Amino acid sequence: MMATLFWLCMAIVVYTYVGYGIVLYLLVFVKRLATKAKPLADITDDRLPEVTLMVCAYNEEDIIAEKMDNTRRLDYPSDRLHLVWVTDGSNDNTNVLLSAYPEVKVIYSPERRGKAAALKHGIKEIDTEIVMMTDANTMLNPEAVREVARLMQDPTVGCVSGEKKVMARSDSDEAAQGEGLYWKYESTLKRLDSELYSAMGAAGELCVIRRQLMTDIPDDTLLDDFIISMEIVKKGYKIAYTSNAYAMEYGSADLHEESKRKRRIAAGGLQSCWRLRSLMNPLRHPVVAFQFVSHRVLRWTITPVCLFALVPLNTLLVLSGEGIVYTIIWILQILFYASAAAGVRISKYFIFMNLNVFRGMAYLFNNSTGMWEKAKRA
């Protein structure tokens, strides 16, 4: 019984972090052999759709000049790109500084109710079909808007997820380095997910939706971008992923600040699993159920439990004299945790990320507003 439980936990951990990527790659490889995708053509300037770039900002006075300089460098006709900043609850100089930019429409409410509420507030004031949501502290590449407009030519695409690139200010910036490695891995899975059928969610750094597909999500939603994009999948549309439109931001200042983010994301992941549980039904959503459970649900729920159960189970099996195989695996596990304690980047961030899932559980039960403390960036 103990050996069975050990191997079950091992299988879940390996499948979540290695196996799914391999299976996904093989499925995409077979799909490429069976079908030939027709590439979408570039759009000439006279046929480009109107797009609204919406930024939800809370007390972002320090970053406005840099963000607006980046926005003005976007390669898109100015008469077709509308700029909206939603600054609900801001009590610094955010609104004053934005008033210096005549092209920006500021939407403001004195009450701070969280990002989900701010997004809904902003969407109501927008009338373009395509809405490009991004964060104040993320910088977009100049071609980003053209790329998402090109992908939105496909009527089956309801959302576009851009790539997130995490920058580190120095080689010693372990939080940013660890986060950057994670997002490289995550971007690979997103690209393959999108090629198989649909990406499993979009990150708020660069999330583009068709306005009419926006769902009225609850104000206490923690992962608003993820829920909004996956609700679009629930309606039968796809999330396209592209690395040609990307958002750049600096990583958290340190692991303590990064823990704030990971804790919120873990809590939001658990919340999302419950609110999107209908997508796990393989009879209604066969491909999406496979992708959603494999890519998201496992790592947000059972996999961290299985990961940290491996050492005690393995120890009991070694003490019971079950065989040399268990002794070898136990030694490898101890070496892995020792490398994390010694500061080896990959193992340390992997353990750190999974530990924060448990902290996220406590965060979820203690947070009912959808608001959070921002992590300080490097």
Feature names for model-found ranges:
Residues V131:
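Short aromatic/hydrophobic "clamp" motif used to bind/position activated sugar donors
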Residues M152-Y185, D220-D224, I228-F292, Y349-L355, ...:
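Catalytic donor/gating beta->alpha subdomain of glycosyltransferases that bind UDP-sugars
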Residues N70, V86-N95, E111, T138:
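A conserved acidic beta->alpha catalytic loop
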Residues D62-E66, R80, N91-A100, E143:
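Acidic helix N-cap motif at the loop->helix transition within catalytic regions
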Residues V23-E50, H256-E257, S278-A289, Q333-A378:
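Juxtamembrane C-terminal module of membrane proteins
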Residues V28, Y108, A117-A118, T128, ...:
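Long helical/loop segments within the catalytic core of UDP-sugar-dependent glycosyltransferases
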Residues D69-R80:
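Short, acidic, metal-binding catalytic loop of nucleotide-sugar glycosyltransferases
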Residues P49-T52, H82, I227:
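Cell-envelope/extracellular polymer assembly enzymes that use nucleotide-activated donors
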